[in-house]
C-alpha cells in the first residue's frame, strides 16, 4: 500500500470523494461567505457558511423540506424546488446580515441550467450579491417547472403518485414563490 517515499496517500475527505481542497482554498481566499449548494435526488440543501479557526460557521440554511411551511406540495428534488430553496436561503442570509457570497458547488459538475445554478439564481433573486455568468442560469420557464408540466401532459398516467398533479406545477410554483415573498 502506502510504503516508500514516492507514494502519497490523498487526504481522507478527498479519498471519500467529499471535498475538492483546491477549489475550497480558492473559495476561502475570496474572503466572502460561501453559498454551499448540495443536491440529491430527493432534496436540495443551501447554506451560507464562513470559515473559522474552529471550523466553518453556518449563518443561514435552507432545505427543500422547509418549503412545506410555505405550501409546497410537489416533490422536493426537482429544479423548481431548488430555485425556491435558494430563494429561501437568500432571504434567511439577508436576515442574518450576509449580503455577499460566492457559490460553492462542491464536486458537482458545472452544467449550465442544473439544480446547483437554480439555487444560485434563487439566492440572487432574494437579494444576495453573487458573482455569476448569466449563461449558466436556466431560463424562467425551466425554473417554474414548465418542462415538467409539459412532460406530464404527454403521459397517459400521472407523473407523481399521490394527490399532486404535475401539470399544475408552474402555477403551484408561482403560488409558493408569492408566499415566500409575502413572508418578508
Swiss-Prot record:
Belongs to the universal ribosomal protein uL18 family. This is Large ribosomal subunit protein uL18. This is one of the proteins that bind and probably mediate the attachment of the 5S RNA into the large ribosomal subunit, where it forms part of the central protuberance. Part of the 50S ribosomal subunit. Contacts the 5S and 23S rRNAs. The keyword Ribosomal protein applies. InterPro entries: Rbsml_uL18_euk. Keywords: Ribonucleoprotein, Ribosomal protein, RNA-binding, rRNA-binding. HAMAP family: Ribosomal_uL18_A. It comes from Haloferax volcanii (strain ATCC 29605 / DSM 3757 / JCM 8879 / NBRC 14742 / NCIMB 2012 / VKM B-1768 / DS2) (Halobacterium volcanii). Pfam families: Ribosomal_L5e. GO terms for biological process: ribosomal large subunit assembly; translation. GO terms for molecular function: 5S rRNA binding; structural constituent of ribosome. SUPFAM superfamilies: Translational machinery components (SSF53137). One of its GO terms (cellular component) is cytosolic large ribosomal subunit.
Amino acid at each position: 500500500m502506502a510504503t516508500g517515499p514516492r507514494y502519497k496517500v490523498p487526504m481522507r475527505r478527498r479519498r471519500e470523494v467529499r471535498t475538492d481542497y483546491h477549489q475550497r482554498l480558492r473559495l476561502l481566499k475570496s474572503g466572502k461567505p460561501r453559498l454551499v449548494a448540495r443536491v440529491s435526488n430527493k432534496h436540495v440543501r443551501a447554506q451560507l457558511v464562513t470559515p473559522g479557526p474552529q471550523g466553518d460557521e453556518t449563518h443561514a440554511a435552507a432545505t427543500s423540506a422547509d418549503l412545506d411551511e410555505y405550501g409546497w406540495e410537489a416533490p422536493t428534488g426537482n429544479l423548481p424546488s431548488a430555485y425556491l430553496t435558494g430563494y429561501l436561503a437568500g432571504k434567511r442570509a439577508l436576515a442574518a446580515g450576509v449580503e455577499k457570497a460566492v457559490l460553492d458547488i462542491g464536486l458537482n459538475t458545472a452544467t449550465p441550467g442544473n439544480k446547483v445554478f437554480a439555487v444560485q439564481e434563487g439566492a440572487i433573486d432574494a437579494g444576495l450579491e453573487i458573482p455569476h455568468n448569466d449563461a449558466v442560469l436556466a431560463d424562467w420557464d425551466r425554473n417554474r417547472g414548465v418542462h415538467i408540466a409539459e412532460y406530464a401532459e404527454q403521459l397517459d398516467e400521472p407523473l407523481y403518485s399521490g394527490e399532486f398533479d404535475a401539470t399544475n406545477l408552474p402555477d403551484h410554483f408561482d403560488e409558493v414563490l408569492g408566499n415566500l415573498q409575502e413572508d418578508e
